[in-house]
């Protein structure tokens, strides 16, 4: 695809953002675009139990392995405020995380290999439900990557607004944190504010729970490691002179390794049990990680990826640090070795998930070219 074709496609995708597992228009446009490419080496597959997902296998001419490339396709419940002439047509929904860029780059790569048969097999996975609903986990757990669709190594990108357009960046180890949703219900006994001895105040219990949780990162995580536990919502009480008999908390846990996350999850449960004993109340702790595992890049594959990018005269590569945001590609990389990387899109005055986020389309061609060059180089290497 030429740059003009990529830009046109990106703008079409940008105008039809859809939420997780509802990506019907997006799926239809992707399928139409893919069916418009030369089909000589293609097998196109849909998943009955995940109907907005799409897989495309490109048959290699002398396959020694199967390399996967994944892009997410869903959008966010955000009202777009970019002022672009091709802004979202769907009220209250926007591609505020740049998945339109992700899809366009993937289609550009696919279009190249439609005309230039790869040495190894390639499988492109157009994944629904990254922002929520665990689309990667759903696909893997239903056996999408078994049999003829087995993948030996997996790659994928995420756009990054604070890097110049077309810049590539990644690192060994963790790139994105793993995340866990925390929901806590504390159940005591309501009563008159003047008679606290006859009630069991869950505002006090909840405050103690939150305070104790803050010691977990400070005292159970090494000073050179990183983790975050944040509570962003608390609901309790109905009026000033009634002691609250119930409290509800919602928060998030983030860490850079699954071992660390497992440990922190258990500490939250332990503190919940302690609060229940201390305040003679019920504490129900629900932790939901779903598919949001840490995005842990495979050392061997990522060293190779970085070296290829550094050796490519057309690529600007920069080092990066891990980030505390989450990405459900982590679940797939927990099952299949691979690498995730950043693609700079040059919107430094905005950020991912912001209503005014507007990635630079100048990143499209460099993104496609860099990945094509990497895949061709990778396929020349011995298994």
From Swiss-Prot:
Pathway membership, UniProt: Amino-acid biosynthesis; L-lysine biosynthesis via DAP pathway; LL-2,6-diaminopimelate from (S)-tetrahydrodipicolinate (acetylase route): step 3/3
MF annotations from Gene Ontology: N-acetyldiaminopimelate deacetylase activity
The keyword S-adenosyl-L-methionine belongs to this UniProt entry's keyword annotation: no
SUPFAM superfamilies: Bacterial exopeptidase dimerisation domain, Zn-dependent exopeptidases
Family classification: Belongs to the peptidase M20A family. N-acetyldiaminopimelate deacetylase subfamily.
Enzyme class: hydrolase
EC number(s) on file: 3.5.1.47
Protein name per the record: N-acetyldiaminopimelate deacetylase
InterPro entries: AcetylDAP_deacetylase (IPR023905), Amidohydrolase (IPR017439), Bact_exopeptidase_dim_dom (IPR036264), Peptidase_M20 (IPR002933), Peptidase_M20_dimer (IPR011650)
HAMAP family: DapEL
Catalytic activity: N-acetyl-(2S,6S)-2,6-diaminopimelate + H2O = (2S,6S)-2,6-diaminopimelate + acetate
Coiled coil (residue ranges): none
Gene3D superfamilies for this protein: 3.30.70.360, Zn peptidases (3.40.630.10)
PANTHER family for the chain: N-ACETYLDIAMINOPIMELATE DEACETYLASE, PEPTIDASE M20 FAMILY MEMBER
One Pfam family named in its UniProt record: M20_dimer
Keywords, alphabetical: Amino-acid biosynthesis, Diaminopimelate biosynthesis, Hydrolase, Lysine biosynthesis
GO biological process: diaminopimelate biosynthetic process; lysine biosynthetic process via diaminopimelate
Source organism of this protein record: Lacticaseibacillus paracasei (strain ATCC 334 / BCRC 17002 / CCUG 31169 / CIP 107868 / KCTC 3260 / NRRL B-441)
Function (record text): Catalyzes the conversion of N-acetyl-diaminopimelate to diaminopimelate and acetate.
Residue numbers annotated as active site: 72, 131
